[in-house]
């Protein structure tokens, strides 16, 4: 039996067991999360949602993104095992729930919450629409273009290069270790979600990635929010460039279809791209719809 089939069938039976039986059986399963150390006390936590990045420091732990409340609590519990350092700073790369819903788990624990000014506005707007204000921990600090702070031998810099995945995407760079957390500015071999309701712009997104490649060098390690099965949530400038080129190819394809008079309804029926690409599978309708709207909104 394949491992995934075993886990699927086991999970079904797992729910029918008593509490004591479940606690006993749970010891035979691996934790659903994974911690990977990258360099100089900087690591990543993956479970469900956007990749969490962190810096372990005696002065306090710096955390980037928070996934969902349950996953954030798993992360918090694991960090407490790594020295009991206080949680000093929580940074959100942007406002989406799979990156910021877990903020609430840090309430009363973290001293500061930081994000781009548009990210905070977007988080507040979505929470008000969904009537989930009581489930939020909003940033108590915001920045516009650049934010810098030195911490434990690291020069921590946040940069905003413009609208992309949303209109509030921050890049977080650890200068000494040369590691940049991109949030959802790079979808590694996954068709991207483009949040037009939060000011996303694919044309500008390409420019943001061009600026990113100019800002950082060939030795920079990048952390990505999401990756396709078989790919990593860390990578190099070649992965950033590959995603930038993918966006341009998709943009040009949709532009050509729009000039031919295609409707959005017919456009999203196209399931494969007419060029060689590592971006495959479901979700092509996401960039198609966004680019179509971007190209036709003033027509």
Indicate where each model-derived feature is located:
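Active-site HxH/HxHxD metal-binding segment of metal-dependent hydrolases
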Residues: 80-148
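Active-site neighborhood of phospho(di)ester-bond hydrolases with catalytic His/Asp-centered motifs
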Residues: 64-66, 88-96, 114-116, 181-183, ...
């Amino acid at each position: 039996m394949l491992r995934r089939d075993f886990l699927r069938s086991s999970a079904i039976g797992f729910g029918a067991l008593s509490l004591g039986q479940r606690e006993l059986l749970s010891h035979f399963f691996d934790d659903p999360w994974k911690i990977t150390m990258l360099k100089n006390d900087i690591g990543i936590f993956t479970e469900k949602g956007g990749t969490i990045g962190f810096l372990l420091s005696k002065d306090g732990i710096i955390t980037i993104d928070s996934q969902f409340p349950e996953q954030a609590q798993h992360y918090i519990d694991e960090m407490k095992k790594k020295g009991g350092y206080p949680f000093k700073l929580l940074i959100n790369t942007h406002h989406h729930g799979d990156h910021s819903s877990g903020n609430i788990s840090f309430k009363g624990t973290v001293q500061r919450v930081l994000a781009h000014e548009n990210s905070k506005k977007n988080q507040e707007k979505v929470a008000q629409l969904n009537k989930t204000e009581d489930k939020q921990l909003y940033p108590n600090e915001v920045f516009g273009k650049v934010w810098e702070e030195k911490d434990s031998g690291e020069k921590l810099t946040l940069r905003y290069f413009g609208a992309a995945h949303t209109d509030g995407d921050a890049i977080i760079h650890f200068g000494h270790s040369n590691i940049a957390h991109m949030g959802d500015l790079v979808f590694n071999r996954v068709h991207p979600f483009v949040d037009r309701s939060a000011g996303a712009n694919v044309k500008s997104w390409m420019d943001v990635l061009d600026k990113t490649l100019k800002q950082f060098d060939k030795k920079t390690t990048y952390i990505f929010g999401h990756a396709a099965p078989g790919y990593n949530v860390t990578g190099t400038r070649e992965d950033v460039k590959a995603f930038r080129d993918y966006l341009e190819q998709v943009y040009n394809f949709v532009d050509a279809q729009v000039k031919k008079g295609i409707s959005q309804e017919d456009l999203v029926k196209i399931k494969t791209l007419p060029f060689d690409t590592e971006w495959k599978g479901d979700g092509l309708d996401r960039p198609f719809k966004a680019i179509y709207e971007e190209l036709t909104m003033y027509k």
